[in-house]
Amino acid sequence: MKFENLLIEVGTEELPPKSLRTLAESFLANFEEELQKAELSYESATWYAAPRRLALKVNALVTAQADKVVEKRGPAIAQAFDADGNPTKAAMGWARGNGITVEQAERLTTDKGEWLLHKAKVVGVETKSLVAEMAQRALDKLPIPKPMRWGSNKTQFIRPVHTVTMLMGDELIPGELLGIESARTIRGHRFMGVDTLELDHADNYLTALETQGKVMADYQARMAIIKADAQAAADAMGGIAEIDEDLLEEVTSLVEWPVVLTANFEEKFLDVPAEALVYTMKGDQKYFPVFDKAGTLLPHFIFVSNIESKDPAQIIAGNEKVVRPRLADAEFFFETDKKHSLESRLASLETVVFQQQLGTIKDRVERISALAAFIAQGIGADSEQAGRAGLLSKSDLMTNMVMEFTDLQGTMGMHYARLDGETEAVALALEEQYKPKFSGDSVPTQPISISVALAEKLDTLVGIFGIGQAPKGAADPFALRRAAIGILRICVENNLPLDLVDLVAKAQELHGANLSNADTAEQVLEFLMGRFRAWYQDQGISVDVILAVLARRPTSPADFDSRIKAVTHFRSLEQAAALAAANKRVSNILAKVEGDIASDIDSNLLQESAEQALASKLNELQPQLEPLFANADYQQALALLASLRESVDTFFEDVMVMADDEALKQNRLALLSKLRAQFLHAADISLLQ
């Protein structure tokens, strides 16, 4: 068996930087899937990507499929021959289709009967003859939302394709990908190195591109160089570069030959809130901002050039010239905005419609204000400050800065509130009202921020459900799923004594006649419960644990979380499986009972020692369980209930529940009902698998 290294490169025009990595990873994953289908073994595989190329390399790929024997079963012997022993038409047709005669067929005998059998030897195909088709299928399955055509070519791809190279070792694999014939020619950097080069061997791909073409095709190596050089450059300026992963990925996808350079801007711009300057540098220019060790923005930035210039000072000056007017715009917006307080902008909110049926933004902030004050009372916070923060929560939407840089909503509200002399709690709440903004984002922890963040999300959630525009399928234009998860996380992570029923009811009350959906509250609560399930599943919580808690429909998120943790712990106990099965048995018995079950147990009717022991154990645990359930200490309560396992097992072994004597039967049903009720204080344990 022989092995060779395979290289495939698709040379294109500039690929979208935000999807470059995904495209390269998908190309490799799809091709590896093709290799597995073709039963072609290999040692390892990797992907490469640069702005104008996607490539993959497969190491130690077998040069041909292994020969194999394929068994082809024919008709059963009873159908293969007639009464005289002559082959039937079915047998002859099958044999002819396999290129043999019936006499040449073998027999397959099993305990189910006997059949004709042909063992066909299939000679393995050379790998090189399969590569082009496999690569084309891999490319066809790439996640490309809007493919394009170019020239007179009917082929579609994410960008026009100019070169295709497929090499197995030093051998060029003939074939066509995306309408382009495979050749040894690959393109170098647009402005440095050779324009094109001829690749002689798959193993020389990275080296030839780097030394002759001035292209670093190894994405990971390119990213590592940018990160290390940027940190070193910041360190040389006495600062720390802020390198977030998304921007690092994007910059890596924009350059073929990374050269890290540093530049400066005027210190006067530091009077503008740092977030606005950073937003401009990162979002518009793809620069890395530099901070001191205390987290204060410095008047420097780091950028990555795609060319190794003989005069880097000229490139630096050019970037400084480009960023200066953008920072000046931010400065102008800030100075202009400062002339008007957030409170003075409330009137202008009346001119902006939030949603046609739900009124203006002014209507919205008045609802948020009242709801935030209500929530603050429930968590022991200052309701006046919460109401104030709610009222001012959207005023920054009318500022020049936020109109220009929409992602700064909330953040600029915080800065303007401080300038207006609002309390720090109110100012902070204006920024934190939108948290958590994404999965993994932190939640607000200050009481006023919590109140406004919950109110802001509840107002949207209840309002949109109230006008019958709940999310359908993947569509969620008002980001209600994110809002729901935010509500749950804020309540759980801050262990808040809040009930969703009360919160939804208050939000619904504040919307007043705006809402046309009579089932608003019920639908919102159902939606929140569904988000709870999704959130816990994402955390790896077992579905049966979630269902066991959902069966009790606890509407306090903090209480829900306590139950989830308690049942998860209970599930790990040795006694859990037996008690879950017993609960299921009890549930089935009680479900078949017609009429009411007595709430009291008559000790005089406890005849069997097993039922006496179970009743005694329940009575013994009762005074210990009551305070635990009252304090939502479900974990300790379930741990105590786990001690019932032996008594429960013995009861079902020795006691006939459905006794002929009606009084005995009813008393035993009452005992089982009491047992099940204790577990149901926490969750429906019978649902555990």
From Swiss-Prot:
One Pfam family this sequence matches: DALR_1
Signal sequence region: none
One GO process term, biological-process aspect: arginyl-tRNA aminoacylation
Coiled-coil stretches noted in the UniProt entry, renumbered to this chain: none
Keywords, in A-Z order: Aminoacyl-tRNA synthetase, ATP-binding, Cytoplasm, Ligase, Nucleotide-binding, Protein biosynthesis
InterPro entries found in the cross-reference section: DALR_anticod-bd, Gly-tRNA-synth_bsu, Gly-tRNA-synth_heterodimer
Location, primary (coarse class): cytoplasm
Catalytic activity: tRNA(Gly) + glycine + ATP = glycyl-tRNA(Gly) + AMP + diphosphate
Enzyme class: ligase
One Gene Ontology CC term in the entry: cytosol
Compartmental location: Cytoplasm
EC number from the UniProt entry: 6.1.1.14
GO molecular-function terms, A-Z: arginine-tRNA ligase activity; ATP binding; glycine-tRNA ligase activity
PROSITE patterns listed in its UniProt record: AA_TRNA_LIGASE_II_GLYAB (PS50861)
Similarity comment: family membership: Belongs to the class-II aminoacyl-tRNA synthetase family.
Quaternary state and interactors: Tetramer of two alpha and two beta subunits.
This protein's name: Glycine--tRNA ligase beta subunit
Organism, as annotated: Shewanella loihica (strain ATCC BAA-1088 / PV-4)
Lineage: Bacteria, Pseudomonadati, Pseudomonadota, Gammaproteobacteria, Alteromonadales
